[in-house]
Curated annotation (Swiss-Prot):
It comes from the Bacteria. Its EC number is 2.4.2.29. GO terms for molecular function: metal ion binding; tRNA-guanosine(34) queuine transglycosylase activity. The gene is tgt. Belongs to the queuine tRNA-ribosyltransferase family. The keyword Disulfide bond does not apply. This is Queuine tRNA-ribosyltransferase. Keywords: Glycosyltransferase, Metal-binding, Queuosine biosynthesis, Transferase, tRNA processing, Zinc.
Length: 379
């Protein structure tokens, strides 16, 4: 992977990542949003439909794909690209967050994490080395190191020990990645909870090891929005300007805008797809909750500013009807729209940075939402 920083507008960055794959070179424009394909599919969507929304890179889930279908099945197909028939770039998370989410079902040691398989109950073990091996078999274009996602709230002492172990795991991830001869990209993950001192140690330690990109992890795990913004604003300047920066698991449209304001290049989140299945649809001036009875006979398009398949062909009344009847098509049309909304938002952001009017875009974005612009700590 090659990353090129093309221009900036304040602290907002406009760049591109280039990946060499057997099918040729693929470019991902940044800032980028990655739809989540947990089990090797963006729920309810074909790869062609996902691509039609504007997506250039997807996220796959190492933990879930390891448990099912497993490495052997993946190897028989070639890799995850062949398995799911998406031949563009894929980033896979390391499994660290999913293990963190298991709570009492897991036990963390220096060697790795022992936990109960949520599918069949057997005890299994995941280590930095094993995570690198799974992601190698997945053929991930961007591999994430194995880390512990520090919970919120956490004491300084817990966050410090967790961050220090994640740094040791980062080195072990780097070593095993290199031993495997993996020629793809490996990203480090900054941890340290809500403590700036720990974030600094983590970032500097990761830069010393050396990675192709750097993620900010351990955010959007329950902390107040102001805390997330504070830590993000503190952390991103510590990361190399010539490497992509990734905010993991975030988030709402406002979170993407705030991340870009603070120098982030990459995002992923289940929100557009999960919310679509629950009738919660993102539009230019806010949210449409399509299950609301007022849409029963509303013959207008979902969003007159949107060019997606759903908005070009169907009314709010039809989407309301499909949802009420529990029709699968409703979830699919909602998903197409939400994913296109996110990609249109990123397109608008990229254009605003190119034209050096990102601050104006931020004001416009919040104005059409009827919201105030959140302050930066360092305007």
């Amino acid at each position: 992977m090659k990353f090129k920083l093309k221009t900036t507008s304040g602290t907002a960055r406009r760049g591109e990542m280039t990946f060499s794959r057997p099918q040729g070179e693929f470019t991902v424009q940044t800032p980028a949003f990655m739809p989540v394909g947990t089990y090797g599919t963006v729920k309810g969507m074909t790869p062609e439909e996902v691509r039609a929304t504007g997506a250039e890179i997807l996220l796959g889930n190492t933990f879930h794909l390891w448990l099912r279908p497993g490495q052997e099945v993946m190897r028989k197909h070639g890799d995850l690209h062949d398995f799911m028939q998406w031949h563009r770039p894929i980033l896979t998370d390391s499994g660290g967050f999913q293990v963190f989410s298991l709570g009492k079902l897991r036990k963390i040691t220096e060697e790795g994490v022992k936990f109960q398989n949520p599918i069949n109950g057997e005890r299994i073990f995941l280590s930095p080395e094993k995570s690198m091996e799974i992601q190698y078999d997945l053929g991930s274009d961007i591999v994430m190191i194995f880390d512990e996602c520090t919970p919120y709230p956490a004491t300084f002492d817990y966050a410090k020990k967790s961050m220090e172990m994640s740094l040791r795991w980062a080195q072990r991830s780097r070593d095993r990645f290199d031993e495997l001869g993996n020629k793809n990209a490996l990203f480090g993950i900054v941890q340290g909870g809500t403590f700036e001192e720990l974030r600094k140690v983590s970032a500097e330690g990761l830069v010393d090891i050396g990675f192709d990109g750097y993620a900010v992890g351990g955010l959007a795990v329950g902390e107040p929005k102001e805390e997330m913004h504070r830590i993000l604003e503190f952390t991103t300047p510590l990361l190399p300007a010539d490497k992509p920066r990734y905010l993991m698991g975030v988030g709402k449209p406002e979170d993407l805008v705030e991340g870009v304001r603070r120098g982030i290049d990459m995002f992923d989140c289940v929100m557009p797809t999960r919310n679509a299945r629950n009738g919660h649809l993102f539009v230019t001036d806010g949210i449409v909750k399509i299950r609301n009875a007022k849409y029963r006979d509303d013959t207008s398009a979902l969003d007159p500013h949107c060019d997606c398949y759903t908005c070009r062909h169907y009314t709010k009344s039809y989407l309301y009807h499909l949802d009420k009847c529990g029709e699968i098509l409703g979830a699919r049309l909602n998903t197409i729209h939400n994913l296109r909304y996110y990609q249109r938002l990123m397109e608008e952001i990229r254009q605003a940075i190119e034209e050096d009017r990102f601050d104006d875009f931020v004001v416009e974005f919040y104005t059409r939402m009827g919201k105030e612009v959140p302050p930066l700590q360092k305007p």
